[in-house]
Structures are given as C-alpha cells and as structure tokens.
Design a protein with these regions (language model features):
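Alpha/beta-hydrolase fold catalytic core
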Residues: 1-42, 63-66, 92-94, 98, ...
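Alpha/beta-hydrolase fold nucleophile elbow
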Residues: 106-115
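Conserved alpha/beta-hydrolase catalytic His-Asp/Glu region
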Residues: 168-228
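Short beta-strand/loop motif that positions the catalytic acidic residue
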Residues: 230, 236-238
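Acidic catalytic loop of the alpha/beta-hydrolase fold
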Residues: 241-245
Length: 291
C-alpha cells in the first residue's frame, strides 16, 4: 500500500524552480513547484496568500496514480513576483501560466484550483490550456457586496499575518485553540493542520509579494467568470462551511457553466484540502477520468 501523508505531516519547502522563457512580448519569469508521481498530468493551483503546500495531503494521494505538479503562483510561496511593470490582470496572467505549463513540459494538463486558483483553472480551460478542471470554491462568481466582504476578510488575514511576532505564532500553532484562531477563516477543521503547516502558511501570507497587486486587480467589478466551457469536463466543489466565498456562489457557477458538476463538500471550509483530503482527491480523480 502506498503511504499517504496525513494532515499532521510537516511538508518541506519546495526546492524546484523552472525558468519560463520570454515569449513574444511576454517576459520571462521563474516559478517554484513540486512534482511527484507518474501518469495523467494534474496541475494544482493554490489561492491568494497561500503556497503549494496547501495541497497536502491531497497531492500525495493523487501522486499514487497521476503525475502531479503543484506550483507556487507568481509572488506567492517561493516564487518571485512578476517582473516590474507586468500586470496581475487575468488577461496578462493566463498567457504567462500557459507559458509556464509549456516550460514544465505539459500540454493541456488537468488543472485543479482553489479560490483564486479555481478562477485561474477555469480561465485556463476556457482558453484551451486545460483538459479538465476541478475548481474548489473558485473566485469570480460573487456579487459586488460578496467580493467586498471577501476582500475585507483577506485584508484582515494579511494584517494579522504581518502583525503577529514569530514567537507568538509558534506558541499559538502548538495548540488546537491557537490553530483555530489563526486558520478557522479558511478551514472548518483547523485542528487537523499541523503546527508546522500553520506556521509556514502564516509566513507565506505575510511574505506574499503578489498579494497586494492581485487584490488590487481583483477589486475591479470585471473580475468575474461569465462564460460556459462546453468542451471540457468541469467539477465545482463548494465547502458546506465556506465562510469566505459563500455557498450560493456555487449555484451561480453552475448556471454559468451548465455542464459542470456541482458538488457540495460536507463539513469543509474554504480550503477543503485540509478538511477532507480523501473527498477532494476523489473529486479530482473522477474529473480526470471523465475525459
């Protein structure tokens, strides 16, 4: 039987980087990533302020039957921010991510994303870069009020991450109550997260150079997903306890993409990979096999 990492297993920082060469008017840039397993290629995209380790232990489960590539988006985790003057707008970022897929030797992989990563996954599919999509609480199906609420929460999380001293962070992460105080906005089961993971993701939020430019671009009312993806299998999963992007946004997503499969994730928060990794991995594999 293949060993699978538990939510309590510390995940080491990535040491792999790919240089994405310039393409036409698009600049070159570097991207950090983790690559495991063999089989159908599956790319994992995290949410704003997070890093590739958000996908543990789902990554390890998927790697038992797929080639899994989890990336740190530009300006998040270990990836440097985009070159000066390069916009974080979707029209700019999606072609750059397409270039990154090519640099990783991938042609139309299956793409899985959470939150911001879910929106990026859907955009990649709509532009022909993805073979299938599993989007977990994807951004882009909000009303103006819902978007403003989410951004206020994110700004609060960022301020908290930047303001907490490391000594206090480590002390809080050692207790279930402390981990809940630090992460219950995004996890329904924060006690499952290891102290090491909580410290690492708080530091990731604190140091994310891509956070401010991404949030600035996302304040635009134009940041919505408003078109069908008729030729690509799409699964949309939404946590029943998502406190950041409310469940009714999943209903809008289904109306926008009528052929998508909308699945409720019982007992899961905004980042369900921690709350029920087996369920998330099963959704991904079902979508991969639907092609």
């Amino acid at each position: 039987m293949t060993a699978v990492a538990s939510p309590h297993t510390p995940v080491p920082p990535t040491e792999s980087f790919v240089h994405v060469a310039p393409a036409g008017e698009r600049p070159g840039f570097d991207l950090a990533y983790e690559r495991r397993g063999s089989g159908e290629p599956v790319v994992l995209l995290h949410g704003i302020g997070h890093h590739w380790q958000a996908w543990e232990p789902v990554l390890s489960i998927l790697a038992a039957s797929c080639e899994v590539i989890a990336v740190d988006l530009p300006g998040f985790g270990a990836s440097p921010e985009l070159p000066e003057g390069v916009s974080y707008e979707l029209d700019s970022v999606i072609p750059l991510l397409g270039d990154a897929l090519s640099a990783l030797g991938l042609q139309r992989p299956h793409v899985v994303g959470n939150s911001l990563g879910g929106l990026l996954a859907l955009e990649l599919a709509s532009q022909g870069y993805a073979r299938s999509v599993t989007a977990l609480s994807p951004a882009g199906f909000w009303t103006g009020a819902e978007r403003r609420y989410a951004y206020a929460v994110l700004l609060g999380m960022r301020a908290g991450a930047k303001g907490i001293p490391d000594a206090l962070l480590h002390r809080m992460a050692r207790s279930a109550a402390g981990r809940a105080a630090l992460t219950s906005t995004i996890y329904a089961r924060p006690g499952r997260r290891s102290p090491e993971a909580v410290v690492a993701e708080t530091r990731s939020m604190r140091g994310a150079t891509g956070f401010a430019p991404t949030l600035k671009v996302g304040r635009s009312p134009d940041v919505i997903f408003d078109r069908d993806i008729p030729d690509v299998p799409v699964t949309i999963g939404w946590g029943s306890k998502d406190r950041l992007l409310l469940r009714r946004q999943g209903t809008r997503a289904k109306k926008t993409i009528p052929g998508a499969r909308l699945v409720s994730l019982p007992g899961c928060g905004h980042v369900p990979m921690n709350d029920d990794p087996a369920l998330v991995a099963r959704l991904v594999l079902e979508t991969v096999r639907a092609v």
